[in-house]
A protein has these predicted regions:
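Short amphipathic helix-turn modules centered on a small-residue break
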Residues: 42-45, 89-94
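An N-terminal domain-cap segment
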Residues: 38-58
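Polybasic low-complexity intrinsically disordered regions
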Residues: 2, 8, 75, 79-82, ...
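Charged, often Cys/His-bearing segments associated with DNA-binding zinc-finger transcription factors
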Residues: 1-35, 39-43
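Secondary-structure capping and boundary motifs in well-ordered enzyme cores
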Residues: 33, 51-58, 97-101
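Alpha-helical support elements that line or immediately flank enzyme active sites
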Residues: 59-71
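Alpha-helical scaffolds flanking conserved acidic
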Residues: 54-61, 76, 80-81
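Short, intrinsically disordered, charge-balanced linker/junction segments flanking boundaries
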Residues: 252-259
């Protein structure tokens, strides 16, 4: 009897895939143009003129890459950098005291979102990985993550960011953005990212999270009916029908930052 593939089984598969993190991150180290990206981000980063000296920009960029590639919350990526040898080596830290806390990581992510850099840099990462055949493309898991932002959030023009919105989740209201992601089922790596206001419904972003080569697509109850929408991707690039395997039970949306 074939065992039905559930989200818990998928999680187990992703955990096994991550045992090769060290080798993968060593490849990332060689192919990502860190100096170029630091130059792009620096004008938006803290100048360190008042208060405590900001964390090294390259360290924050490396943590950002880990967070986005492995779909980790602010607190989770902080703990992983502390606990995982592969992550700490990639970030160049050898003491927990060198690792920024979750709030600091969240504020850095907000800086990138507010200046339109999160998607730009992430898409460059995925383009590089795809050209190096470092991402498998058999199945995609779609999900979304809330990115909290202060109500005073401003964009690069110093105006109130109109892309940030409020949404009610359960009994709580959240203000900020939503990161919609497409995750490779086999490697656990995020291959597509779309940032919208927090009030954007999960299912509407589904086509933007697919690369077109998947045979199967997985999602929670927020994606019910995705295959029936007018803009649905029903066949992959090989002409085969994509199997939509949507879990009827709701998942708990992660809230990444409290800044």
């Amino acid at each position: 009897m074939n065992k039905q593939l559930t989200f818990s089984l998928i999680s187990d598969e992703l955990a096994q895939a991550r045992t090769s993190q060290k080798e993968f991150l060593e490849k990332i180290e060689r192919i990502i143009p860190f100096d170029e990206w630091i130059g792009i981000i620096r004008p938006c980063y803290y100048k360190g003129e008042h208060g405590n000296k900001p964390y090294d920009l390259e360290l924050m960029l490396r943590i950002f890459l880990l967070q986005n590639l492995y779909d980790l919350s602010d607190m989770k990526v902080m703990n992983e950098v502390i606990d995982s040898r592969a992550f700490s080596d990639f970030c160049g830290v050898d003491s927990p005291n060198q690792v920024p806390d979750g709030d600091t990581i969240g504020r850095f992510r907000n800086i990138l979102v507010e200046n339109g850099l999160q998607e730009k840099l992430f898409h460059q990462v995925i383009d590089i990985l795809s050209k190096k055949d470092l991402i498998l493309k058999r199945g995609t898991i779609v999900d979304s993550t809330l990115i909290a932002a202060p109500s005073s959030t401003k964009n690069k023009d110093k105006k109130r960011d109109k892309d940030a919105h409020s949404v009610k989740k359960g009994n709580q209201w959240h203000f900020g953005y939503k990161a919609h992601i497409g995750v490779d089922k086999d490697s656990g790596l995020v291959h597509h990212l779309k940032v919208t206001g927090a009030n954007e419904h999960d299912v509407t972003a589904t086509p933007d999270l697919m690369h077109g080569e998947e045979e199967e697509l997985y999602g929670d109850s927020g994606y019910i009916g995705a295959e029936k929408r007018e803009n649905a991707v029903v066949k992959n690039k090989n002409g085969r029908k994509i199997k939509y395997k949507i879990n009827r039970k709701p998942s708990t949306m992660k809230k990444l930052s409290k800044s």
